Swiss-Prot record:
The keyword Cytoplasm applies. It comes from Helicobacter pylori (strain HPAG1). A divalent metal cation binds at D6, E7, D103. The gene is rnhB. It is found in: Cytoplasm. Gene3D superfamilies: Ribonuclease H-like superfamily/Ribonuclease H. Belongs to the RNase HII family. GO terms for cellular component: cytoplasm; ribonuclease H2 complex. This is Ribonuclease HII. Its EC number is 3.1.26.4.
Length: 204
């Protein structure tokens, strides 16, 4: 049994970070590969939602999804939020797996406590369980940004999913940041202006 871990929303200017863990056998993983599973970035949103449902309802799959808000990222930092989310997944899913595979190049020092952790660069392209985790994380991020888009249509979140596209950055310059923007990120990019109150009033 392998536990795969991946995230979505790491580089966004808005919305939460989602980290997912999926544990299953190689035999079960093969079923999903036959359904067209691959790195979530290479799947359409419709296909991600389809696979998300199949993963969550499969009797032989264990999964856990952790959300860290923009506010948490601003107060703790992105790296700390990633580490905390991975710890939560390991505490909730580690008993299921004899192998733990994390997408990327860092285990955040957790390999001292969990010696069976492997970090794999582009693991979402080569390890089915990481690709499955990638689907759950990205589908959760998609859903969040579609819901937030209904509140703030000018930022194009239904299309850019919170990433810093030209339209998104231009909207921040023109309208200011929303309470769902990561202010530590927008300040770093010098695109935050003092119009926060104006958009906050829409939430009241």
């Amino acid at each position: 049994m392998t536990l795969g871990i991946d995230e979505a929303g790491r580089g966004c200017l808005a919305g939460s970070l989602f980290v997912a863990g999926v544990a299953c056998s190689e035999k079960t993983a093969l079923e999903f590969l036959k359904m067209g599973l691959k790195d979530s970035k290479k799947l359409s949103q419709k296909k991600r939602f389809f696979l998300e449902d199949k993963i969550k309802t499969h009797g032989e799959v264990g999964f856990f999804v952790v959300k860290k808000s923009a506010e948490a990222i601003d107060s703790l930092g992105l790296g700390a939020c990633l580490k905390l989310a991975i710890e939560e997944i390991l505490e909730n899913g580690c008993s299921l797996a004899n192998e733990i595979k994390i997408d990327g190049n860092t285990a955040f020092g957790l390999n001292k406590r969990y010696p069976n952790i492997q970090t794999i660069i582009k693991g979402d392209e080569t390890i089915a369980q990481i690709a499955m985790a990638s689907v759950l994380a990205k589908a959760a991020k998609d859903r969040e940004m579609l819901e937030l888009h209904a509140l703030f249509k000018e930022y194009g979140w239904d299309k850019n999913c919170g990433y810093g596209t030209k339209q998104h950055i231009e909207a921040i310059i023109k309208l200011g940041a929303t309470p769902f923007h990561r202010h530590s990120f927008t300040l770093k990019n010098r695109i935050l202006n003092p119009k926060l109150l104006e958009v906050e009033q829409r939430l009241v």
